[in-house]
């Protein structure tokens, strides 16, 4: 389960890089202070994936902490990025992560 999660996170990063969604500079420090789900008021969906979701999941993996067993990110990404032509390609690793977590106790 943990190895599969790591692989899906790596695939998400690779996909974001291939789609030119991966950024070299993080958002301003204030953007990370958001209390809204997905930091919707301070970050774009792809920024949130790169700078919040992926690092938090990696930190859980590295520390041996329990992974979330209920994840629902794809509906937000679908709505926030509905105009993005390669949306389905981006959703593939996200849906795989959701299915893995939602079908297993971590």
From Swiss-Prot:
Q: Which GO terms describe its biological process?
A: single-species biofilm formation
* Cited InterPro entries: UCP006257, YqcC-like_dom, YqcC-like_sf
Q: Name one Pfam family in it.
A: DUF446
Q: Hey, which family's this protein in? A: To the N-terminal of E.carotovora exoenzyme regulation regulon ORF1. The C-terminal part is colinear with YqcB. To E.coli YqcC.
What this protein is called in its record is Uncharacterized protein HI_1436
Q: Which organism does this record belong to?
A: Haemophilus influenzae (strain ATCC 51907 / DSM 11121 / KW20 / Rd)
């Amino acid at each position: 389960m943990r190895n599969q999660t790591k692989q899906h996170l790596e695939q998400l990063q690779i996909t974001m890089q291939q789609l030119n969604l991966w950024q070299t500079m993080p958002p301003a420090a204030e953007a990370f202070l958001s209390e809204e789900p997905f930091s919707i008021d301070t970050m774009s969906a792809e920024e949130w994936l790169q700078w919040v979701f992926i690092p938090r999941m990696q930190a859980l993996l590295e520390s041996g902490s329990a992974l979330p067993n209920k994840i629902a990110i794809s509906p937000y990404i679908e709505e926030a990025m509905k105009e993005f032509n390669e949306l389905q390609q981006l959703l593939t690793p996200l849906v795989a992560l959701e299915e893995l977590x939602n079908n297993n106790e971590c």
